[in-house]
Amino acid sequence: MKSPTPALMLQGTSSNAGKSILTAAFCRILLQDGYRVAPFKAQNMALNSHVTADGLELGRAQAVQAAACRLDVDVRMNPVLLKPNSDTGSQVVVMGRPVGNMRVREYMAYKPVAFDAARAAYDSLAADVDVMVLEGAGSPAEVNLKAHDIVNMAMARHAEAKVLLVGDIDRGGVFASLVGTMELLDPWERDLVAGFVLNKFRGDATLLSPAYDVVTGRTGKPFLGVVPWLHDLGLPDEDSVSFRETLAGRAPDVPAGGGMLDIVLVDLPHISNFTDLDALRREPDVAVRVVRSPEQLGSPDAIILPGSKNTLGDLAALRSRGMAEALCALRSAEGGHLGPVIVGICGGFQMMGRFLADPQGVESDHACTEAGLGLLPVTTEMGSAKVLRRTSAKTVSGWCGAGVAAGLMPGTGGGHGGAEVCPGEGYAVHGYEIHHGVTTPDAGGGAVLVCLHESDGSPAGWTTPDGQVWGTYLHGVFDADGFRRGWLDALRVRRGLEPVGRVVARYDLDPALDRLADVVREAVDMGHIYSVLGLSPKGRRQT
């Protein structure tokens, strides 16, 4: 009988302990050391998702981990994806395709089917590589959930994986969490744990030695590393908790006389694919902040309405907070000054239209039609069919996503040192679509122009003639370095600032993954980890 593929698994004492990032780190380390490696997470609950080349959906974290392995994204890496669309239910996606919306008890009954799919996907993927790196979810010691576990110890047992238990030391109480987790595990589960890794440490690691002795004495498990707090890593956040925490300390406004652009993301209860903002956050002249109320808006240069897993519900939330009224008030120029550019992506794009129709009850209990924000003269009709595809598009000649600012004509760079902010040939953009519904211009409902188009001429984005409002279904539209800088420079000119005129921040995950791997390699005992896996370094590849 063939031996199972060696497997390492990252589990945590809590959510947001850093399992996804550390999984990516070990994927890149193993790749650097000469192994064919692939990531795997049996079940992911997330609103950040990605689309494979063949139009299948999986968690965004596994797409980043695939990049760490320098592999194309494969749906087998995340066979079960849960996308919460209410407080008690989720859309269930199995092997990249939605199988229905389920409440908690419905999904519990469905879990044996989901676990069968997960095991089959794992076995197939593991047969293609030298070593697997698995990620768990939450904590393996949730005693009320263990009977239905398919993502932590049950998956580790199937894979015969060696488990590293990760604790977030920055939150405090990590040693109690490690001991408590081990106490709540069954004996067979404890046997799978190879050791502990502390994550997000700030300070002198030598001061931790007394705690190691106590915890190892109680559990019999060694500490295999202390990973430092990683600043400005340049990789997408795992979930909305970490994303909101990252931006929580931003200043409420950026002084009008400063050189920084103030870009606001409107927070939504069911926000999805907020990774659309990651590339903007890397720009040196941009401050991105999250707002939840009209009082926090200030006077930004741009406002972004992000994706949503429950567009109708989040639109109602905007109204109840007063945000809908505030956004509409900012649509018009006041006092002779240009108002902020307002951008909608996916669900945010749908909200910006005049109407949202849901005749099949995709997002509601019954057929309904709701008024949108009325910022774009378009209407969306929800449908049960889910659009999942990668898309390449190009900006319409001379359009740069911020209107034509005073003193700057498209494609001329007039009066601003010759910097070409809106090129005549247009910018190439690439991304993916994940949505229910079709959006079309209203017949006779006001002027709206195509601003992005695919190679066959199909519209991929719409804008008002003045360029102040535009929307697209394209997740990742700001990942394109040229378009992103052109848009930001147009915002700068709109504010009376000099355009930068060149790409200064390249959105490339590969160097960030190498930096991550270097830090983690230095922080953990790779010799011990290779030993428990029955492997040895083959000699590092050139990166």
From Swiss-Prot:
It comes from the Bacteria. Pathway: Cofactor biosynthesis; adenosylcobalamin biosynthesis. The active site is at 346 (nucleophile), 475. One of its GO terms (molecular function) is catalytic activity. One of its GO terms (biological process) is cobalamin biosynthetic process. Transmembrane segments: none annotated. Keywords: Cobalamin biosynthesis, Glutamine amidotransferase. Residues 260-483 form the GATase cobBQ-type domain. Pfam families: CbiA, GATase_3. Belongs to the CobB/CobQ family. CobQ subfamily. Catalyzes amidations at positions B, D, E, and G on adenosylcobyrinic A,C-diamide. NH(2) groups are provided by glutamine, and one molecule of ATP is hydrogenolyzed for each amidation. HAMAP family: CobQ. PANTHER family: COBYRIC ACID SYNTHASE, DETHIOBIOTIN SYNTHETASE. This is Cobyric acid synthase. It comes from Nitratidesulfovibrio vulgaris (strain ATCC 29579 / DSM 644 / CCUG 34227 / NCIMB 8303 / VKM B-1760 / Hildenborough).
